[in-house]
Amino acid sequence: MRVVLRLPERKEVEVKGNRPLREVLEELGLNPETVVAVRGEELLTLEDEVREEDTLEVLSAISGG
């Protein structure tokens, strides 16, 4: 799957295999408590199954100010 990270810089990575979002975030070294993931217009939960053909966008859930 293609994963677009915006944390805050933009970076694209490829991840292989179908699995729960939680496992994808762990593989990428991301803390699931500090990011949100979107597939199209759908906000994903950590238990949602993501598939190899998906494109995900991962955004920081914490902002400074």
Swiss-Prot record:
Question: Gene3D superfamilies from the entry?
Answer: 3.10.20.30
Please tell me whether the keyword tRNA processing is annotated for this protein. yes
Modification after translation: The C-terminal glycine residue of TtuB is first activated by TtuC as an acyl-adenylate (TtuB-COAMP), and then converted to the thiocarboxylate form (TtuB-COSH) by the cysteine desulfurases IscS or SufS.
Any idea what a deletion of this gene does? Disruption of this gene completely abolishes the presence of m(5)s(2)U in tRNAs, although its precursor, 5-methyluridine (ribothymidine) is present; other nucleoside modifications remain unchanged. These deletion mutants exhibit a temperature-sensitive phenotype, they are unable to grow above 80 degrees Celsius.
Nucleotide-binding listed as a keyword: yes
Q: Where is this cross-link: Glycyl lysine isopeptide (Gly-Lys) (interchain with K-? in acceptor proteins)?
A: G65
Chain positions with 1-thioglycine modification: G65
The organism is: Thermus thermophilus (strain ATCC BAA-163 / DSM 7039 / HB27)
Record location of the Glycyl cysteine thioester (Gly-Cys) (interchain with C-192 in TtuC) cross-link? G65
Kindly list the biological process annotations in GO that this record carries. tRNA processing
Q: Pathway, per UniProt?
A: tRNA modification
Q: Which family does it belong to?
A: Belongs to the TtuB family.
Q: Quaternary form?
A: Is able to form a heterocomplex with TtuA.
Keywords assigned by UniProt, alphabetized: Isopeptide bond, Nucleotide-binding, Phosphoprotein, Thioester bond, tRNA processing, Ubl conjugation pathway
Its function, per the record, reads: Required for the 2-thiolation of 5-methyluridine residue at position 54 in the T loop of tRNAs, leading to 5-methyl-2-thiouridine (m(5)s(2)U or s(2)T). This modification allows thermal stabilization of tRNAs in thermophilic microorganisms, and is essential for cell growth at high temperatures. Thiocarboxylated TtuB functions as the sulfur donor in the sulfurtransferase reaction catalyzed by TtuA. TtuB also functions as a protein modifier covalently attached to lysine residues of the target proteins TtuA and TtuC.
Q: Which residues carry this modification: Glycyl adenylate?
A: G65
From the Swiss-Prot or TrEMBL record, give the protein name. Sulfur carrier protein TtuB
Q: Which InterPro entries match?
A: Beta-grasp_dom_sf (IPR012675), Mopterin_synth/thiamin_S_b (IPR016155), ThiS/MoaD-like (IPR003749)
Q: Which domain of life is it from?
A: Bacteria
The UniProt GO MF terms for this protein read:
nucleotide binding
